[in-house]
Amino acid sequence: MNSSTALMCFALLLISPLCMGYSDEDREADNLRIAEIIKNAQDDDSKINSTQELLDIYRRLYPSLTPEERESIDKFVNEHTDAIIIDGVPIQGGRKARIVGKIVSPGVKGLATGFFEELGSKLAQLFTG
């Protein structure tokens, strides 16, 4: 009985890396995608439209971050998403809700593009160390 328990534990150790939700390949793919998003987002509209994808990558990456990294980015996201107003109405649906509408007032474009650039920079730093 003791040897079968040891064998089961050994098998679980071999299988457990295959069951992880965010693999090294996923991490590398997200790293490349962040670089591509930042490189291709040249104008304000493309930056604003790409912000949600950066937030989606952050959500996938979240469980693998240290508490300090999570707190830093969460604080940044919370501060800025509370201030973003689309068509004169504040965002709704939580701190990481979709923040980009079809029409963003010109006064908010600077804030939204600054948010994109800073979030992209913070996420890129997580991958480069």
UniProtKB/Swiss-Prot annotation:
Keyword Secreted: yes
Signal peptide: 1-21
Subcellular location(s) per record: Secreted
Record InterPro entries: Turandot (IPR010825)
Induction: By stressful conditions such as bacterial infection, heat shock, mechanical pressure, dehydration, feeding with oxidative agents such as paraquat or exposure to ultraviolet light.
Organism domain of life: Eukaryota
Keywords from the UniProt entry: Antibiotic, Antimicrobial, Glycoprotein, Immunity, Innate immunity, Secreted, Signal
Keyword presence, Transcription: no
Single GO cellular component term: extracellular space
Expressed in which tissues: Expressed in the fat body (at protein level).
Carbohydrate-modified residues: 49
GO BP terms: cellular response to heat; cellular response to mechanical stimulus; cellular response to oxidative stress; cellular response to UV; defense response to bacterium; innate immune response; response to bacterium; response to cold
Family note: Belongs to the Turandot family.
Described function: A humoral factor that plays a role in stress tolerance; gives increased resistance to the lethal effects of bacterial challenge and stress. Regulated by the JAK/STAT pathway and NF-KB-like Relish pathway in the fat body, upd3 in the hemocytes and Mekk1 in response to septic injury and consequent immune response.
Note: Flies overexpressing TotA show prolonged survival and retain normal activity at otherwise lethal temperatures.
Official protein name in the record: Protein Turandot A
Gene from which this protein is expressed: TotA
